[in-house]
Amino acid sequence: MIKQPALAQEQYACVYAWLALLFFREVDDEGLMQLQSAEIADWLALLKRQPALTASVAQLEQKIAALRQRQDAQLELAADFCGLFLMTDKKSALPYASQYLQKEPGMIKHLLLEAGMDVNDGFKEPTDHLAIYLELLSHLHFSLGESFQQRRMNKLRQKTLSSLLEWLPEFTNNCVKHDPYGFYAALSQLLLAIVRFDDGEEDFPIVAAG
């Protein structure tokens, strides 16, 4: 009997795409409204059903609720983003694999090539940016719904997760240490929990979101 995954491929894909956006650019006014929307609350409630994710989801929910108490929440979130992800001092958490690995950051390029993907010309960040890993994982989970390439895409998913887990824990630790208000700290902890949870799903059957 085939074991069903705790989350469907489409659900993983959507969550990874959402997280990629949050780690790639500052939250604007529209993004802040979305964070506080019923839609995001429903998504977080879905994730919270998984015991491995419950604590990190609850922490992020608390930080989202706390944004309502912060004056100029959007501007302050933008400042947090800048301080963590754009600065180069010791109190930052730069979102690039090459900041944490003692080797050339070429793995993501090979993974993208295997997936038949390329970085958009408009993307001005280095290719080893966290958002690229997350967009790749989103693409791979959507592709797992196509039975003719499921085995290849599942193998590539595992390689991508393993590559990401080589440096994501240290990135998360830096977010926790250096995020003064805790939103991005909570977000990074949720991301790490999801990636580890996904990494435990060794062989996905074909299943659609219900």
UniProtKB/Swiss-Prot annotation:
The keyword Cell cycle does not apply. It comes from the Bacteria. One of its GO terms (biological process) is protein complex oligomerization. GO terms for cellular component: cytoplasm. Transmembrane segments: none annotated. It is found in: Cytoplasm. Gene3D superfamilies: 1.20.120.1820, HscB, C-terminal domain. The keyword Repeat does not apply. InterPro entries: Chaperone_TorD, DMSO/NO3_reduct_chaperone, HscB_C_sf, TorD-like_sf, TorD/DmsD_chaperones. Keywords: Chaperone, Cytoplasm. Its main location: cytoplasm. Belongs to the TorD/DmsD family. TorD subfamily. Involved in the biogenesis of TorA. Acts on TorA before the insertion of the molybdenum cofactor and, as a result, probably favors a conformation of the apoenzyme that is competent for acquiring the cofactor. This is Chaperone protein TorD. It comes from Salmonella arizonae (strain ATCC BAA-731 / CDC346-86 / RSK2980). The gene is torD.
